[in-house]
Regions:
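N-terminal hydrophobic signal-anchor/signal peptide
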Residues: 1-76, 97, 243-245, 270
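A hydrophobic, helix-centered structural microdomain
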Residues: 54-140, 249, 254-270
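Short Ser/Thr-interspersed hydrophobic loop/turn segments at strand-loop and sheet-helix junctions
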Residues: 88, 223-224
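Flexible acidic/glycine-rich loop/turn elements at helix↔coil and beta-strand↔loop transitions
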Residues: 93, 229-231
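A short, structured surface patch at a secondary-structure boundary
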Residues: 137-138, 150-213, 256-263
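A short, polar/charged loop-to-alpha-helix boundary motif
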Residues: 140-148
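Long, intrinsically disordered, low-complexity Ser/Thr/Pro-rich regulatory/activation regions
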Residues: 212-221
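Acyl/amide activation-and-transfer machinery of modular secondary-metabolite enzymes
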Residues: 233-241
């Protein structure tokens, strides 16, 4: 980080936690805009408050149209691969082809006057939705439905599942989530409610990610491997905040292009 000068934060804005209704002024370490971001290395950073991450105003209709068109084209192009993946999952292990899971989505309340006093089911920071994936684990991977953080060389992952996860093919059904309006192609990855609540308690700025629609891929995903520790999550949150700073359709296209080698060369991670 030599040559990087600290950037002063001009003001602090009080931010009330949606989870507990308490007033606080959390800060987050994020990459300095314009600094080179490299996987496996901490980015050049500055300290800023949550208010600095308000997403840029963009035409919702243009953004929605862009995502629908791209998702539709990708769905058509990827349909042969998805068909082969479905057959492989079905023949290789007992259980359904698709894995449906609840995730925390966009929080539409953050910019409304009464948002701070509203509470959702399970006190989540966004609207829950069902995410679609090709099943990559055994059907008994989670005891009693309790969320278990996936780890490297997880023995719950099937042989076919290892390939699907490494190539990110297991995420392709989420193109349907994009068409439904649950997700965008690019954005912060959505998390399960129980894990979201835990991370929100340990990383003060974590709920800020919900101010934009979650995505299939993102800056954090093309820059980092699978997260296995809390520090890994903090690092990905920093990249998510940087994405929110420079969010644009051109930035989305750039991340989409960077996702291609991630899939083909099996680098980076979700």
């Amino acid at each position: 980080m030599s040559g990087i000068q600290p950037i002063p934060v001009p003001r602090d804005v009080l931010w009330r936690s949606q989870s507990a209704g308490r007033r606080s002024t959390p800060s987050v370490t994020v990459p300095v805009p314009g600094a080179e971001l490299r996987a496996g290395q901490p980015p050049a950073v500055m300290v800023a408050t949550s208010s600095d991450f308000e997403p840029r105003l963009r035409s919702e209709r243009v953004t929605r149209l862009f995502n629908v068109v791209v998702a539709s084209c990708m769905l058509v192009a990827a349909s042969p691969i998805m068909l082969l993946a479905a057959i492989a999952v079905r023949l290789s292990s007992r259980g359904p082809v698709f894995y449906l899971q609840e995730r925390v989505g966009l929080d539409r309340r953050w910019n409304r006057t009464r948002a701070i006093n509203e509470r959702r089911r399970e006190d989540l920071g966004g609207a829950p939705f069902t995410i679609y994936k090709f099943r990559s684990m055994r059907v008994d991977a989670e005891v009693n439905g309790q969320a278990v953080w996936a780890k490297k060389d997880d023995d719950r992952v099937t042989r076919v599942g290892k390939f699907l996860r490494a190539s990110r093919i297991d995420e392709l059904p989420q193109l349907l989530n994009v068409l439904r309006g649950d997700m965008n192609i690019v954005g912060p990855r959505p998390e399960r409610p129980s894990i979201f609540v835990r991370l929100r308690e340990q990383i003060a700025e974590y709920p800020v990610r919900q101010r934009v629609r979650p995505g299939i891929t993102g800056l954090a995903q093309v820059s980092n491997p699978y997260d296995q520790t809390l520090d890994d999550v903090r690092r990905k949150v920093a990249f998510d905040m940087e994405y929110m700073r420079r969010q644009s359709l051109l930035e989305d296209l750039r991340i989409m292009l960077k996702t291609v080698p991630v899939m083909l060369l099996r680098i980076g991670g979700w």
